[in-house]
Amino acid sequence: MERQTIVILDLGGPNNQIIARRVRECNVYCELLPFDADIQTIKNFDPAGIIIAGSVNDRQITLDKSIFELQVPVLGIGQGQLLIVRTLGGKASVQDSKYQKAQITVDSTHSLFEGASINFEGWVNQSAKVDTLPLDFCSLASIKQNKNAAIANDKLKVYGVLFHPEYNNTQDSIKILKNFLFNICKVSPNWTMSFYARNYIKSLREKIGDKKVLCALSGGVDSSVCAVLVQKAIGDNLVCIFVDHGLLRKNEADEVEKYFKDQQGINFLRVNAQDRFLNRLKGIRDPEKKRKIIGEEFIRVFEEQAQKIGEIDYLAQGTIYPDVLESANVKSHHNVGGLPKNIKFKGIIEPLRSLFKDEVRQLGLTLGMPERLVFRQPFPGPGLAVRIIGEVTKQKLDILREADAIFREEISLVGLDKNINQYFAVLTDMRSVGVRDEERTYENILALRAVTTTDFMSAKWAKIPHSVLERVSSRIVNEIKAINRVVYDITDKPPATIEWE
C-alpha cells in the first residue's frame, strides 16, 4: 500500500494548526507532532513526506539529522527552512518576528513551483536570512536582497521556503503546497469524509460487536456528529444521555430530542434536571464557581442515569483533533462537563479524534445531518449560565433566551449567519433608566456580541450593518419588557475574550 500520511513537525507558534488544516484541505491526511518527536514515532506513521513549520524563533532548536535519512521528501516552511539549513551545515539567521507581505520571484521550472506565477506576494519574516547554503543545495526563489527565499536539494528531496504559503491561501500558495504533496511526495487526494466514514464504521463494527456504548450528548456539533457516526456503526447498541440542565437556548432541548429520538431513531434518554441545576446555582455570582458547579452536577446526573441503564462497555465522546494537540491526555473538559470518575468502561471511543472542526462539520453533512445542527453556533458547556452576569435565575434565563433568539433570528434573516463565526446576547447585571408608555422604567441592559475568526484564538468584532443592529435593538426592547437598553460589544480578542464570563 502506498504511503499516504504527511507528518508535520511543529516548531510552535500561535497558528501551528494552519498548515495541517491546509494539507487536509488538499484531501491529504496529516499528523501534527512536536518538532523533537523521536525518530521511531515519526517512522510509525510511515510518512510519505515531512513538513517542518512554525513561527517560534529559538536558535537553540535542533533537528535530528536522521530525519533526512528516512528517504522521504522534507519541506521546511519559514523557520523550518532556517532549521534545515543550520542542521545540514549551512548558515542562517533571524533577528525577530516581523512578518510582512513581500514580492517573491521563483524558478517556475522547478517541480515545487510548477504552475505557479513567477512573481507573487507572500508572508515572510523580513529578518530571516540564509547566508550560506548547505552542500548540494540550490536557490529557487528570491525576496528583495534575499536570494535564498526557497532552496532545494533534489537528490535528498529536501526543500525549504522562507515565506508561508499556508497564510496566503491564494491560488499560487496552494499550488506550491499541492506540488509538494502530489508531485514530490506522490500522495493521492483520497482523504475525504466519505472515505473516513466508511472506514470508521467498518472498523468500529469489528471492534464493538454486540457490546453497548454510552454517549453523553450535549446537542453540540462534536457530540452530535459523534453520536450519529457511532449509531451508523452499531445501531441500537448505542445509548445517548441528554442532560437538560435548563441552560440551553430557546427551544434547543426540544430540537435536540426531536432530531435524535424521532428523526434519527437513536436510543435517547432526556433527563430533566433544570430545577436541580438552578438550586445548585442559587446565590452564585463568580463565573468560575458557576462553571465548576455545572460540570460537577452534570457528572453526578450522568453517573446516576448510567448506573440505571446497566452494564455499559464503552463511553463515546466528541474529542476532536485540536483537543488532542492541546494535551497528551484524554480531554477532561469535554463540552458536557468531563468524564465520570467512578463508572467503569472497557474503553473510550473517540470517532472524531483525528478531525479538525471544519472536517467534523463536513462529516456531519456526509452523514446526512441537517445544516442547522452541523453549523450550530459554538456554545459554552455551562450554557447561558456564563452569559448571565451574576446570579443565574429562571427569570433571567427566560429573558436572555428570548433576546438571544431575536438576535439570532435577525442575523439569519439577512444571511449573515454563515459570515459571522459566533454571535449571542449577554444579560448584564446592570440596569438603566428608560421610558416606556410615557412612564419611567428601570430595567435590564442587554449586550450583543458578534465576532469573526478563523481559529477562535483571536477574533475581530463583526461589523454588522447599523440597520440590522437597529432592528434587533428595536425588537428586543419592544418585545421584552424587562429590557430597556441594548448595547453592542466592539472589542476584539485580545484584549477581550469572546465570551463575557
Region spans (language model):
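Short, well-ordered beta-to-alpha junction loops that form the rim of enzyme active sites
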Residues: 163, 317-321
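Short beta-strand-loop/turn "lid" adjacent to the catalytic site in phosphate-handling enzymes
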Residues: 320-329
